[in-house]
């Protein structure tokens, strides 16, 4: 364990044990206990753990430890304990073996659902040594586990055991236990009920470092909830026709297991934000193409800073080029970005030409620092630890002279760790930088220190940096994003998208709007981080909007000004809510409309305020959002997904339909979403129809345990607030529409009631007292109604022809396998009017090349053939009113350079006459049953009216 705070605690505990020893033999049985679990000991050995909530007992027989130091194997059972110390939260046993003192430290703090065990090694004389292997735990566990689930490959992150209730024959496990080391190198050996847990640090330890303290071994107990999800993320975006069948046939994880692991990680966080982090990442608008040494380039980047501030960001990476300070020809990294590092000073730092604690800041950099300070935004440095730093030959000795590219320092060496941290601190102090985005950090070289030592060095760098600069921003990317939650305790968050943000780096969800594609990937990443990597919301990364394409149609990565306009007018709000709903603490804001002057001017004050208000909302509700967790299931084709952030008798629910067809979301008002108490609730819509109350079919207010079933339009995000009902309300309560309600005598009057054009919702009103009404008017129109007790219901028809967002032309048929489809439709005049108004509000003069991207030019009326797992080798053809129409293929990487970015096929129907009957024929290729999702109109937003049809 390299956590400095824990080292200090352990050292103090050992000092107490020395000053206040107790006899090792003949002592009474010891126990550690808190409000959740009790650990019982037989002499110096752990004998049992008891879950005090459920009554489950895990019996632990022949518990032991072992370790290997300098090739010498030491087994705990062969040693005699010489001292023990019991405090309120710890139990320490000391053993002596030539030439070492070994201390075994058990700890159980208040609030923990787990016990930890560590080994501390102290040589009897000040000598250096090598720790080969740590086996902190070996035992025979009873009862026998009914089932087990390794975490990561071969259990390298830990293991889960499931146990039945009692001694019956139930096949449904009722209790669970997790066992893990706080590192990604767990090793397991089993022989019947006996098992050992170890890891092999193979790390050299100097006496000057102090005692060697092992990583904690954790054992947690918990009742299982019965709410299960896939234990591994469903590969993007594989079509699963029967989710229940898939769940039954594949490994599952219980939500209680996930929650227990998340709480274990949370207990050791070194960074606990009090407000949300808001950082802009301008390489997502290709800021590397900008040279801030030129006047035009500086003005362009100033727009980026200004816009980042306007949408509420506190930080922005600073990654444009500066030809006065660095050049491409001097780059020595594998990716060709070294000229952008450390505010363009990275090459000089590597070569020793500029030391941040000594050298002056160049004028062009000082100008940038001054501008950011005046705008009250902190600049974040993009930084690579794995570069050919030659200040000490020891660092790159492993590479045998082949340095540069991917070959950099050995992270297992303390000399480099200390030098690197010193440079990072000096740079912050010299420039006022807000923090770092670490990338190109290789910690798994084959010929250097052990992989554990390299990983441990990365962890030590991060923890030391956090200790020296407690408020620093730390964004962590390749490669340490792959090494699990114990790597990330000191950082702000790991990589926001699991891998690079470029469109080619991940499989695209089929959708014509890139921000929705990106949002679906973000929720997939958040699911993976929460459900497979057990990341608490405090350090879980969001991702807002997208990264624009860098390569042209010839597959050339452009370093000149290329695709500087790429704002997804109709997709960005879905992306904002997707990120907030899954990662409310870390708002990673990517592409913003700033580089292009036309986009910069067109982004309205209303949109800026909407953006800021939602980020502010997360700060206001942070106490509840700490409880954010998935509900319903993983993001996938053909299903709705969501999250809940609930505690006690209130909370929030975010629901997302990534599909184009309308689908239902279903969840229960109970512990599965975090609701712990209360009997009756109100559900209020926060988005899209702010202030609308959703009524229970059984009577307006919702009951504890009731199932909530809500229909979501295609591509819709729905945000709900749940709170205790106002059962004693003195005024009528209106449900399912926005408006006002009042009772005059025996007449119920609803005014300012709005509904989507062409819809027919059921309106509910819950009356106060025992009022019986004999008349109902809605917006001045008499309406028929029913009254049952206090509840009045009426179904009303709002005027106009229904033509909704993602308007469908074909009813989904799960048995359809391709072939000919015929459909007829009429486009209301109001739809073309809506498109014209949007073009007036967003008057960006797109080029023909711009419009290859289907998300640009949102004034166009597009018809999309939505296919799950689309294949661009299979053509779709269409005829309209008997004439062939051009069918275009859409790609999230725009030019089709990577086939996994194929989004599907569409036609542009912008030139059609309104209010005229049209006949469409579509010929689809042979498809697996159910993969064709339907035909949908794109770029339509809901429109509302107060006109009621009698």
Question: Where in this protein do the model-derived segments appear?
Answer:
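Beta-strand-rich recognition/accessory modules
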Residues: 31-33, 96-98, 109-111, 124-137, ...
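C-terminal beta-sandwich/jelly-roll accessory domains of carbohydrate-active enzymes
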Residues: 628-639, 648, 655-950
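Catalytic domains of carbohydrate-active enzymes, especially glycoside hydrolases
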Residues: 300-325, 430-434
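Bacterial N-terminal signal peptides
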Residues: 10-20
């Amino acid at each position: 364990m390299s956590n400095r705070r824990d080292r200090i605690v352990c050292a103090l505990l050992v000092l107490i044990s020395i000053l206040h020893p107790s006899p090792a033999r003949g002592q009474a049985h010891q126990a550690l206990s808190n409000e959740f679990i009790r650990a019982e000991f037989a002499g110096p050995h752990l004998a049992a753990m008891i879950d005090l909530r459920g009554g489950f007992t895990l019996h632990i027989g022949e518990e032991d430890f072992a370790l290997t130091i300098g090739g010498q194997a030491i087994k705990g059972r062969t040693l005699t304990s010489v001292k023990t110390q019991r405090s309120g939260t710890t139990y320490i046993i000391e053993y002596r073996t030539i030439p070492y003192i070994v201390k075994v430290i058990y700890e159980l703090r208040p609030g923990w659902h787990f016990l930890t065990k560590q080994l501390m090694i102290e040589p009897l004389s000040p000598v250096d040594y090598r720790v080969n292997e740590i086996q902190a735990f070996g035992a025979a566990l009873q009862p026998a586990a009914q089932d087990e689930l390794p975490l990561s490959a071969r259990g390298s992150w830990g293991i889960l055991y499931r146990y039945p209730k009692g001694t019956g024959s139930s096949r449904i496990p009722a209790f669970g236990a997790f066992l893990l080391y706080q590192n990604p190198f767990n090793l397991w050996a089993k022989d019947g009920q006996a098992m050992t847990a170890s890891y092999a640090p193979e790390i050299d330890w100097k006496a000057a470092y102090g005692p060697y303290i092992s990583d904690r071994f954790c054992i947690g107990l918990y009742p299982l909830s019965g709410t299960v999800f896939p234990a591994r993320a469903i590969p993007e975006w594989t079509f699963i026709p029967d989710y229940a069948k898939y769940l039954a046939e594949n490994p599952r994880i219980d939500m209680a297991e996930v929650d227990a692991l998340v709480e274990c990680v949370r207990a050791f966080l070194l960074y606990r934000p009090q407000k949300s982090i808001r950082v802009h990442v301008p390489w997502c608008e290709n800021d590397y193409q900008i040279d801030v040494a030129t006047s035009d380039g500086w003005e362009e980047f100033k727009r980026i800073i200004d816009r980042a501030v306007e949408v509420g960001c506190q930080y922005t990476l600073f990654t444009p080029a500066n030809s006065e300070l660095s050049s491409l020809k001097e780059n020595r990294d594998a990716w060709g970005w070294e000229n952008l590092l450390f505010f363009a000073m990275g090459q000089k730092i590597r070569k020793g030409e500029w030391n941040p604690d000594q050298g002056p800041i160049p004028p062009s950099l000082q100008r940038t620092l001054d501008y950011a300070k005046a705008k009250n935004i902190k600049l974040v440095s993009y930084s690579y630890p794995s570069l050919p730093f030659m200040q000490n030959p020891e660092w790159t000795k492993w590479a045998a002279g082949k340095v540069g590219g991917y070959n950099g320092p050995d992270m297992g060496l303390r000399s480099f760790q200390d030098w690197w941290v010193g440079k990072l601190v000096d740079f912050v102090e010299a420039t006022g930088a807000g923090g770092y985005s670490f990338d190109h950090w290789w910690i798994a070289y084959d010929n250097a220190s052990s992989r554990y030592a390299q990983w441990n060095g990365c962890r030590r760098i991060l923890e030391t940096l956090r200790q020296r600069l407690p408020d620093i921003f730390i964004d962590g990317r390749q490669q340490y994003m792959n090494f699990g939650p114990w790597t990330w305790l000191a950082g702000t968050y790991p990589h926001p998208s699991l891998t690079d943000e470029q469109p080619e780096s991940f499989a695209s969800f089929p959708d014509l709007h890139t921000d929705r594609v990106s949002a679906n990937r973000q929720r997939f990443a958040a699911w993976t981080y929460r459900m497979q990597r057990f990341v608490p919301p405090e350090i879980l990364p969001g991702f807002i909007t997208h990264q624009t394409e860098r390569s042209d149609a010839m597959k050339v990565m452009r370093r000149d000004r290329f695709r500087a306009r790429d704002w997804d007018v109709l997709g960005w709000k879905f992306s904002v809510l997707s990120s907030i709903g899954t990662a409310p603490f870390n708002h990673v804001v990517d592409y913003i409309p700033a580089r292009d002057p036309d986009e910069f001017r067109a982004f309205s004050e209303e949109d800026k305020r909407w953006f800021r208000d939602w980020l502010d909302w997360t700060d206001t509700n942070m106490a509840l959002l700490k409880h954010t967790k998935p509900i319903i299931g993983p993001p996938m084709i053909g299903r709705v997904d969501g999250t809940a952030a609930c505690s006690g008798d209130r909370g929030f629910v975010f629901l997302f339909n990534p599909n184009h067809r309308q689908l239902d979301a279903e969840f229960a008002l109970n512990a599965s979403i975090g609701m712990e108490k209360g009997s009756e609730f109100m559900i209020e819509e926060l988005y899209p129809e702010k202030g609308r109350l959703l009524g229970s079919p059984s009577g307006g207010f919702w009951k504890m345990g009731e199932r909530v079933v809500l229909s979501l339009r295609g591509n819709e995000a729905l945000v709900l607030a749940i709170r205790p009902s106002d059962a004693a309300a003195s005024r009528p309560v209106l449900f399912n529409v926005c408006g006002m309600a009042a009772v005059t005598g025996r007449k119920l009057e609803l005014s300012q009631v709005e509904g989507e054009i062409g819809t027919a919702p059921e309106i509910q009103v819950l009356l106060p007292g025992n009022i019986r009404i004999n008349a109902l008017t809605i917006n001045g129109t008499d309406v028929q109604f029913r009254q049952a007790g206090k509840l009045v219901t009426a179904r009303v028809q709002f005027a106009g022809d229904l033509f909704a967002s993602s308007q469908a032309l074909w009813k989904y048929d799960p048995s359809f396998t391709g072939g000919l489809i015929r459909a007829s439709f009429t486009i209301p005049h109001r739809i073309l009017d809506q498109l014209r108004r949007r073009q007036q509000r967003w008057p960006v003069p797109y080029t023909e090349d711009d419009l290859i991207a289907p998300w640009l030019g949102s004034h166009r009326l597009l018809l999309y053939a939505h296919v799950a797992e689309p294949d661009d080798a299979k053509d779709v053809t269409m005829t309209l009113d008997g004439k062939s129409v051009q069918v275009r293929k859409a790609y999230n990487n725009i030019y089709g350079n990577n086939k996994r970015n194929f989004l599907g096929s569409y036609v542009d129907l912008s030139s059609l006459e309104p209010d005229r009957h049209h006949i469409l024929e579509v010929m689809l290729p042979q498809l697996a049953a159910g993969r064709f999702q339907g035909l949908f109109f794109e770029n339509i937003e809901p429109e509302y009216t107060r006109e009621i049809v009698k």
